[in-house]
């Protein structure tokens, strides 16, 4: 076979994969906001508070679910998926995360809302099917919220962790890149880790349109805008390595296990994002990174059962990295 024939065949494969993704991804990428799992919500009686935190940047109060790890405790920010709801954070809807982390010495913080936001400061108003609002989520998470928690709840404003799923996995890493003193730990579960590359911007735009009717251009401008590169974890590896950020990176392969998640959307999407995670690991190692856990299991779909299992497995690592004192809180 000639070199030209090989190139044509390779281009054809890319076009087929791209077309399939473009047709399928809009309804899939936000699956993280779907129906609750059988293990949804923590048991009653836990000291979970529902805070209304003022945000000058967004011009409204933001609901935050909070469980204290004790005075002076480090914080774990659990970030939601693309279809984040306005009533509860997806981690609470779909897992007993508060129960898992009760008396762990870690304050658990779940911001509520932010559908399709990527937890970013958007260029323009976020206009969707429900109307327009201001999205300045990075400002909220890195300035307004930590100041409020330090002043009112005794939570450390530095040495924290950000853990995200799907949409917010890349957000967790970018928060650590941009705010290394606040976020010394970033957990990314089943995220697309090269969003600026290839068809990434187009597919993200389609998915955001499906999840609330939002436009990616309002977030970071056209795909040629440098904001896309600034928010691409695969291009920010030198900063993550240089800051010695502790990373926990997970992605399944689209094959369900006994945990569940056996449905076509969850299987397709997990398999779709896996390659970006494998490439990220290779680039991280090549850059001299040595402070990461990579879990690329021989099973796992794009669903809460697997993300919950990872959050459970992550707890001792979080406690060690953040210097938490077990038994704190409650």
UniProtKB/Swiss-Prot annotation:
Keywords for the protein's UniProt record, in alphabetical order: Acyltransferase, Disulfide bond, Secreted, Signal, Transferase
Catalytic activity: 2 alpha,alpha'-trehalose 6-mycolate = alpha,alpha'-trehalose 6,6'-bismycolate + alpha,alpha-trehalose; an acyl-CoA + a 1,2-diacyl-sn-glycerol = a triacyl-sn-glycerol + CoA
Residues annotated as catalytic: 166 (nucleophile), 270, 302
Disulfide pairings: 127-132
Binding sites annotated in the UniProt record for substrate: 82-83, 166, 194, 272-275, 279, 302-304
Enzyme class: transferase
Protein name in UniProt: Diacylglycerol acyltransferase/mycolyltransferase Ag85B
Lineage: Bacteria, Bacillati, Actinomycetota, Actinomycetes, Mycobacteriales
Gene: fbpB
